[in-house]
Amino acid sequence: MKIKQFSGFTLILTLMITLMFVSSCTQKPFEHEGWKISVDSEKETLKIEHELIGLLLKDMLLFSPDNQRLSDWKINLTASKLTITTNSPQESTWTFLVTNNKLQVHTSLAGSYLLGTAPADEERIPARTEEEDNGIVFTSLGFISARNIHSLFDIPTDTMIKFSSQAILTRNEENIRQMDVKIKLDPEATVSLVPDYYLNVLGLKYYQPRPKRFSTAPVGWCSWYCYYMGTTEEDMIRETDALARLLKPYGLEIVQLDACYTRGEEANYLEWNKEAFPRGGKWLFEYIRSKGLKPGLWVNVYGSNYAKPECAEKYPENFYLRDKEGNLSGACCTADKTVVRLDYSNPEVIEKHLKPMLSILKNEWGLVYLKDAGWGTWMDYYDQNREQAFDSSKGSREIYVEVQQAVRKTLGDDVFINGCAMHEVGLCFGLFDGSRTGGDDKAIWYPQKERGMSMQTFFHSLFGANYLNNIVWFCDPDVVMVRNPLTYEEGQTIVSSIALTGQTYMASDFMDKLPTRKLELYRKTMPTTPIKPVDLYPFRILKNKRNGVVWCCPQVKEFPRAIDLKVNGVAGDYDVLALFNWKDEAAEQSFSLEELGLDPEKEYHLFNFWEEKYEGTTSNTFTALIPPHGTLVLIIKEVKPYPQLLSTSRHITSTISLNKLNWNPDSLTLNGTSSVVSGDTYSLFIWKPSNLQVTKVEANTEVLFHREEENGLLEVKFSSNLPEGAAHLTWNVIFKSVNK
């Protein structure tokens, strides 16, 4: 068989036709001042990009006010403007004009809209800015969207993408890492970029995205607010035993010894006070690990015992900082003045003291959590006595960063480093995994004197710095405590706040002495989850800067009315709302669906998490009487015409235990799998419509009971004693139709 040969002319003609066809479909893009708008003439769609962030919007379509797609485009390009004329089914003119970091869109058909998709993955997150503040702090868990969220923040580039206030961003059903964006024009709309948002708008001088060494903030126990400087080995054994028994099954991991162990002339960070810790630090670390927990330690890395240093018989005199009179200075927060400040302008201090000491703590002792203290006051002292330093040409901030670089390099990426005793925020973004953001708190609600310690300090830090959490590091507002004289209601407010913001969760209570009711506050809020802030600004800040630079210990003007955690998880989309009463007497508190960014044209279930009570539904507002300093936590979920899981008994977010969930409309079965805590019962709280009735509950463990209420609430309680080899609880709730 002969193969027909194409002539050169035929081949050239074919290529020309192909090129003409491609050219007719692909319009030359409009490019101006960093913006790029590409037009696909065949599909009649737009793609919008910017040099700062790459792709902004794609597959953009034009729609008329009556929801008809506008087609038959005619394109006109000038140096600074793109114009699209549509001819079917309506004539209209659309202009796209860019000026610096703004894209302005105008249409001749008021009420028309643009519809497309925007990248919105883990690195480009839903956001709100300060002008949108309504007294509620919004946070997110999973790929969420809401009617009151009109911006996306691009974490890697520190760029805020602000759509118009009438824009509606909803998750794409086929790809939850994208947003469907609807931009209404009346007759104009603007898309704005705010570059260097944290750096310039918020004044965060050293902005750097949080390295992904850890996915969630740590959960643990700290000795300080139980025993302070008097902590002993016996105390640590007793608390470790209690933590392993009572809270380890619920997610607590770290047992952290705080300052105390270096007191005495012979004690240092490696050779502890023998009276208080007769078997030493390495033995205690091994004991903690033997209980399935992880050892953590407070260390002022800017100090060392002068008489008996850690890594030599005697350090050279030029290892230490001195004042103008030649005196040594006690390091911050250590047990006594035997630990003095080191002179890190001398590089030998890092090589011969810091690195060897930390290497022993990690590689020989098994350190996994470092509370890295003392640097704020060290910098102050260095600046005051710089002339006496080994190398006075070095500034305190330069030295500080060098020290922390050495700490990170020595400890590696598997040790959580939590900065402590900070001043200026951000010098060690990228090196710290987390940091304290404020002063010390105390297990009382109000301070006993002006500027005294109390849980008010905790709340100022938590709300004033939440915009940093899981963006640049994990924020540590200081420890959580619920013991007396704090009331049960105050304890609910404290644990609900930390759990719904996802900040570092370090408790400091005598766990084996807590009443069961208060212990349950910890159990139902541990572990932490990878929550991100939606509100990317310091909440109603009174003071958080010095000389224009963000400083520690933020003070807010007032605490928020509520925290609204928006969740996208196994159980679908829902809100976990903590509604606060900060008053000293019982008071009514309210919210509306519109305030939460929910659809006021729909109806929503309300489930009271702490009281395990169904509060009915709302399509507008809800009001409740809340006790003084108390919190009402509601799970809010859109009503559907089939059985819905509202909550579990395990965790305030309902995300920790639930692994799978499915409703089968053919067999009328709600089924799923859950992770349960051995020795603890596990409940599902389900709403069912009135036309369905439970016929059977099946599980791979004992079903303790199921109860139904007239309002539609169904509770099913299971034993946690699973069969040998079973990793999860598997369950089926089977219904049948009934006439109503």
Model-derived segments and spans:
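Carbohydrate-recognition beta-sandwich/jelly-roll modules
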Residues: 29-251, 287, 369
